[in-house]
Design a protein with these regions (language model features):
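Short alpha-helix
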Residues: 151-167, 174
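Conserved alpha-helix/loop element of class I SAM-dependent methyltransferases that forms part
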Residues: 1-10
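Conserved class I S-adenosyl-L-methionine
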Residues: 11-18, 109-136
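A short glycine-rich, Lys/Arg-flanked "PGG" loop and its adjoining helix->strand segment in the class I
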Residues: 92-104
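A C-terminal cap/extension of S-adenosyl-L-methionine-dependent methyltransferases
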Residues: 173-225
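A short acidic, Gly/Pro-enriched loop at the edge of an enzyme's catalytic core
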Residues: 67-76
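Class I SAM-dependent methyltransferase SAM/SAH-binding core
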Residues: 22-64
Length: 225
């Protein structure tokens, strides 16, 4: 929410695409913003509406949203779907739809799962790297090669740059919302409230540093439609 607040205006209308159980939609509604949510999974919608019965949410696929008008949103959030869309072509379908439904010059927030976090925390830390490389799940450049039936796809900054170029999207900024936090979860849980508050302050301060963003578990690419 820290970075969202930097860019959204009080009268902004937002689409939350791939809203899940409505975490972001609920927070934005509580601050007075107008939000329409789209979510693929019916169960998530049910949980969402039980907690937020006045929410405007519709079931749909981020890659094809004919029920949303062209150029309607000041800001579009795409903070989940690209985790699960395997390969450039599927991701581009969602990016192009987000671009279509956003006003020309409006902003799109796009979240990605990062390759290096998974390589370090799963492949090496759990001693799986040799087996994964032997079967081609990780290539010689240590890039995870997700298959079409897998749940997650992982990217590097170069991949995001390529997608932006192909979709005709211009970057405003790119940031890591979590930084090193997923590497040090147990330590964070042991911190005093004062130290944890200082860590949050630190993460906000370094979240846009180009030398750090690719190592976190997620990044959010803020682009202009």
């Amino acid at each position: 929410m820290h970075h969202l607040r930097r860019f959204i205006k009080p009268d902004s209308f937002l689409f939350d695409i791939g809203a899940g159980t409505g975490r972001y939609t609920s927070a934005l509604m509580a601050e007075g913003y107008r939000v329409k949510a789209v979510e693929l999974v019916r169960r998530n919608i049910d949980v969402f509406l039980k907690r937020e019965p006045t929410a405007d949410v519709v079931q749909g696929d981020a890659r094809n949203m004919p029920f949303l008008p062209t150029g309607a949103a000041d800001v579009t959030l795409l903070l989940g779907p690209l985790y699960h869309l395997i390969g450039d072509e599927e991701k581009l379908k969602a990016l192009n739809e987000a671009k279509r439904v956003t006003k020309p010059g409006g902003l799109i927030f796009v979240a990605y799962l990062m390759n290096e976090y998974s390589i370090l925390s799963y492949c090496f830390d759990e001693d799986r790297i040799e087996g994964l490389m032997e079967r081609g799940a990780v290539d010689g450049d240590f890039h995870i090669q997700a298959q079409a039936d897998e749940l997650y796809d992982y990217v590097r900054i170069d991949d995001i740059n390529r997608l932006d170029e192909r979709a005709g999207l211009k970057r405003v900024t790119i940031f890591s919302p979590d930084g090193a936090s997923d590497y040090m979860r147990t330590r964070l849980n042991r911190m005093s409230d004062e130290t944890f508050a200082r860590f949050i302050e630190y993460q906000k301060c370094i979240s846009e540093r180009a030398d750090l963003i690719g190592a976190g578990s997620h990044v959010v690419d803020v682009v202009r439609a």
